Amino acid sequence: MDHSCQTLTTVSTPDPFMVFANGSYYLTFTSGDKIEIWASKTLNGFEETARKETIWTPPPGTAHSADLWAPELHAIYGRWYVYYAAAHPKHGNKSHRMYVLGGPPAHEDPTQGQWEFLGRIHGMPDQWAIDGTVFELHGGLYMVYSGWPLDSDDESDLMQQLFIMKLDDPTMAADGASGEPVAISTPEQPWEFSRDANGDHGINEGPQFLESPDGGWKGIVYSCAGSWTHEYKLAVLHYSGGDPLDPRAWPKGQEPLLQAGWGRQGPLWARARKLPVFGWQWRQRR
């Protein structure tokens, strides 16, 4: 097993997400006012060899034209999709919602085909939401995202939970109760909090569904505490089986998975993919 650490870029690429498809590596990351994809046939010298394409720039002044965060590129049911959070330029962070773009067929290069704006996830509540990721489990399609509590009008941003919801298709929540978001993780451990002048921030965000190569382990790795602090770390929800919409199916680890030591570096954002060079344990930190 290769445990080497490889630097892919020398420039800032926050919230990175990488997939390998059709013989190429595709990287998306937070660009702020647009959605970019970098594509290369190799990880060696990735930044120098990558073709850098902007696939979407929102019309100015719209509800989704500011602070485009954490785009993820997924091939689902034969088509490319990008999921991302965006805000209204006049309303700021409190207006962040999840959006989706539809692209070319999955067998084609996503940097070369046409992309269209498909809007918000249909059937999703009008809730502050970021960091949405999608995955298939037991034949169903699910989205997990970070959101403010559904049962509160508080916009102080002191609490971020992880929610799961079932999708009927890549753009629409399932009908009935199965399409309603369910909180599967609420900050409760001391190491999930950070304090600043506004109070104690309990933060769960950046979820990523992972599965071991043999399928023996499934779960969600997520980031917690304040990303602006030295306390930011990674933690795990283990999928224990049963209904993915049952919070009891996602027991939380009793300690962080990965956290900073005394040095200047620490974990921020976890992504893992089956890649032909490094295997499923390849990681890229935000």
Residue ranges of model-derived segments:
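Carbohydrate-active catalytic/glycan-binding domains of CAZyme proteins
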Residues: 1-286
